[in-house]
């Protein structure tokens, strides 16, 4: 049953992504409402997929790459729905939904069988670690989209070619604020994710830090965002610099999440292609 809900939500995310892109092109408000409805129903179906997966498996269903990709996509869509309530940046869905859809399609190609839980994952700290880590990463996805929108808007304003996208994008100040707010929320969550992961590692392997490739790249990503926040607060990094760094930071997030799992050997072998 969980796989059915997963597939249904994937179809709805596809519809939402297409509708959001159509909203940018045709500038019709009803298309935006269609996109939001598809995303909302898809999120509900996705929630049911996670709940039924938990019931079927008997443990927190974020233990392999299929489940991790699905969970990451679910959080991103959830943040989009929250952002739709708290901000007026309706066009954000045109950038976030394709990310979630890509994650879902990647997950769709992976084995979906439920397997016995690896002993290392039988930890009190495991659910907290994954929740904090994925929440932080998803918020950085919002900052990534904000950075892309900032660069697009800045270029169109400089060239004085105000196209369909620019007409829907918020002001540069609003996008810069979105970037900063995402950073101030995402960085503490990433920090908590690393701390809970270290505590979990001590219980699982007897050491808080093992310099595993995943741990090393998590630290690199943390240092990147720490530098961004420091430069923002002390030097006043704003605008274009902040936008570019948010894009670079999220690419580091993706490499830490996917690249390390699939390319580099380490303790996180349970998160590989399986």
Residue ranges of predicted features:
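Polytopic transmembrane helical bundles with strong interfacial aromatic enrichment
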Residues: 1-274
């Amino acid at each position: 049953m969980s796989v059915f809900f997963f597939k249904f939500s994937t179809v709805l995310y596809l519809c939402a992504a297409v509708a959001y892109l159509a909203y940018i092109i045709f500038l019709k408000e009803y298309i935006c409402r269609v996109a939001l409805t598809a995303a909302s129903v898809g999120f509900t179906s996705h929630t049911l997929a996670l709940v039924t997966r938990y019931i079927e498996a008997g443990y927190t269903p974020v233990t392999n790459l299929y489940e991790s990709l699905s969970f990451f996509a679910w959080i991103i869509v959830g943040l989009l729905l929250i952002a739709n309530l708290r901000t007026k940046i309706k066009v954000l869905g045109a950038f976030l939904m394709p990310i979630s859809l890509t994650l879902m399609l990647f997950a769709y190609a992976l084995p979906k069988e439920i397997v016995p839980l690896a002993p290392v994952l039988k930890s009190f700290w495991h659910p907290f670690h994954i929740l904090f880590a994925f929440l932080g990463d998803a918020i950085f996805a919002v900052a990534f989209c904000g950075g892309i929108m900032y660069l697009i808007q800045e270029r169109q304003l400089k060239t004085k070619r105000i196209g369909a996208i620019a007409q829907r994008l918020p002001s540069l100040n609003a996008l810069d604020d979105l970037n900063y707010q995402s950073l101030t929320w995402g960085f503490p969550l990433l920090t908590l994710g690393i701390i809970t992961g270290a505590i979990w590692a001590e219980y699982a392997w007897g050491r808080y830090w093992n310099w595993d490739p995943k741990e090393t790249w998590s630290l690199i990503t943390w240092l990147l965002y720490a530098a961004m926040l420091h430069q923002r607060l002390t030097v006043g990094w704003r605008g274009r610099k902040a936008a570019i760094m948010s894009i670079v930071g999220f690419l580091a997030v993706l490499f830490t999440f996917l690249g390390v799992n699939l390319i580099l050997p380490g303790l996180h072998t349970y998160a590989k292609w399986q």
